Curated annotation (Swiss-Prot):
Coiled coil: none
InterPro entries on file: AceGlu_kinase-like_sf, AcgluKinase_fam, ArgB, Asp/Glu/Uridylate_kinase, NAGK-C
Compartments (UniProt record): Cytoplasm
Primary role: Catalyzes the ATP-dependent phosphorylation of N-acetyl-L-glutamate.
Name this protein carries in UniProt: Acetylglutamate kinase
Cellular component GO terms, alphabetical: cytoplasm
Keyword Amino-acid biosynthesis: yes
Oxidoreductase is among the record's keywords: no
Sequence similarity: Belongs to the acetylglutamate kinase family. ArgB subfamily.
Organism name: Rhodopseudomonas palustris (strain HaA2)
PANTHER family hit by this protein: N-ACETYLGLUTAMATE SYNTHASE (PTHR23342), N-ACETYLGLUTAMATE SYNTHASE, MITOCHONDRIAL (PTHR23342:SF0)
Residues at which substrate binds: G69, G70, R91, N196
Enzyme Commission no: 2.7.2.8
Annotated GO biological process: arginine biosynthetic process via ornithine; L-arginine biosynthetic process
């Protein structure tokens, strides 16, 4: 490991001076941050992320964290000998799997992240969409084309849900008391059934309901790439739809961008897809002139 570069006091002052107008821009604004399971990395990385979240709160930003946990769920399922299958990019979640998903997301990752934020001096509260009926969902459906018959078939994803309604009562109370909500992407149906919700989709629904200033989707790629694999720094909704249509945006990036478009249409001012493995990615995006990742806007 190499030593960090030495920054002179003057350079430190310049960095703070550059950050000031950005801090003023986000003063008292709500920022929803989706922290993906792949972006979590090692414990030191998670603790650094937690410190950055506390810094946001100290600068009068209202951060709301939604975390994923795909790799951690996969590890636990393998340890328990439970096979896991995917369809249309979503984990098929049967009765045994949903219990493990809830245990890992709400019982392990959520509380660990809450602990890191509190250790850094923040006041985080760990919840999932089931708490206070915050997020109500319905069963998700996807269609896939059978490779042999070429017939489109409906895929049963089990207990995978799509958000239908977000009740802001609990979130607004937490934000109003300067507490940091940390949300696991689990929801409940009107009949009380627990659903596993894609973390990007969950974050988009929450951000849209809150009319957040920004939604940040931290993932394991730099952002949206063009056909030469170079980062596209900024896109309008119209541009994004064109890139989906011509195949530039493909695979797992399509649902992420669709989540961005949904959030923007619900009133979020801007959405950024960025690499969560980059140190201090959230601060780089919000508090520097250059930013990082791909900004999608109306």
């Amino acid at each position: 490991m190499t030593d960090a570069p030495i920054i002179s006091p003057l350079d430190q002052a310049r960095i703070l001076s550059e950050a000031l107008p950005h801090m003023q821009r986000y003063d008292e604004e709500t920022i929803v941050i989706k922290y993906g399971g792949h972006a979590m990395g090692a414990e030191d990385d998670a603790k650094a992320f937690a410190r950055d979240i506390v810094l946001l709160e100290q600068t009068a930003v209202n951060p709301v964290v939604v975390h994923g946990g795909g790799p951690q769920i996969a590890t636990m399922l393998k340890r328990l000998g439970i096979k896991s299958e995917f369809a249309a990019g979503l984990r098929i979640t049967d009765g045994a799997t949903i219990e493990i998903v809830e245990m890992v997301l709400a019982g392990s990752i959520n509380k660990q992240l809450v602990g890191y934020i509190n250790e850094a001096g923040g006041k985080a509260v760990g919840l999932c969409g089931k708490d206070g009926n915050m997020v109500t969902a319905s069963k998700a459906t996807r269609t896939m084309v059978d490779p042999d018959s070429r017939i489109e078939e409906v895929v049963d994803l089990g207990f995978v849900g799509e958000p239908e309604k977000v009740d802001l009562t609990l979130l607004n109370q937490l934000i109003g008391h300067e507490l940091i909500p940390v949300l696991a992407p689990l929801a409940t149906s009107s009949s009380g059934q627990t659903f596993n919700v894609n973390a990007d989709t969950f974050a988009g629904a929450v951000a849209g309901a809150l009319k957040a200033k920004r939604l940040l989707l931290l993932t394991d790629v730099p952002g949206v790439l063009d056909q030469t694999k170079k980062l596209i720094p900024e896109l309008s909704i119209k541009d994004a739809r064109k890139l989906i249509a011509d195949g530039t945006i493909s695979g797992g990036m399509i649902p992420k961008v669709e989540t961005c478009i949904y959030a923007l249409e619900q009133g979020v001012e801007g959405v950024v897809i960025l690499d969560g493995k980059v140190p201090h990615a959230v601060l780089l995006e919000l508090f520097t002139n250059q930013g990082t990742g791909t900004l999608i806007h109306k």
